[in-house]
C-alpha cells in the first residue's frame, strides 16, 4: 500500500514537472518583443516556438519581487503601451508645431515658393517704383524748365510793351512762383522717396546675397 502511494506521488510529480504556471515574460528575438503562449498549458523544453501563438504585448508583472522600494519605483515607471502613447502624442505635437511653422513661412513668402523668389519679386517691384519715380521726376523737371522759359519770354516782352503788360506780368509771375514752390515741394518729396527706395533696395540686395 505504501509502495502504491509512493508510485502515485512519483507519477504525479512527473506530470507536474512539465507544467508551467507562471506569467509569460517578454523575450528579445530579432529585435522584436514577443511572448510564447503554450495552448495546452504543458510547458516542455522541446515545444516548437513557431507552433505557439505570438502576442505583441508586454505584461506588467515582474519576474520576482524586489522589495517595497522597487514596488514604489515600479508605480512611477510606465508600461510599453503608455510609453508608445506618450511618444505618439509627442509626435503629434511636433507635427502641429511644424505645420504652424510652415503656415507662418507661407504667410511671410506671400504665396512664393522660396525666399529667393520673394526677394526677386520685391526687387522687381522696387525697381519698377524707382523707375516710375525717376520718370515722374524728369517730367516735373521738364515742366519746371518750361515754366522758367515761359517766364523769360514774358520778361522779354515787357521791353516791347512795358506799360500795357505790367499788371499781366505781375499776375503771371505770382502764379509762376506758386507753381515753382509746389514743384519744389514735390521735388523734395520725390527725392526722399527715391532715397528711401534706394536704401530698401540695398538692404534687400544684401539680404538676397546672404541667402
UniProtKB/Swiss-Prot annotation:
InterPro entries: Fibin. The keyword Glycoprotein applies. Keywords: Disulfide bond, Endoplasmic reticulum, Glycoprotein, Golgi apparatus, Secreted, Signal. Glycans are attached at residue 30. The keyword Endoplasmic reticulum applies. Belongs to the FIBIN family. Homodimer; disulfide-linked. Seems to also exist as monomers. This is Fin bud initiation factor homolog. It comes from Equus caballus.
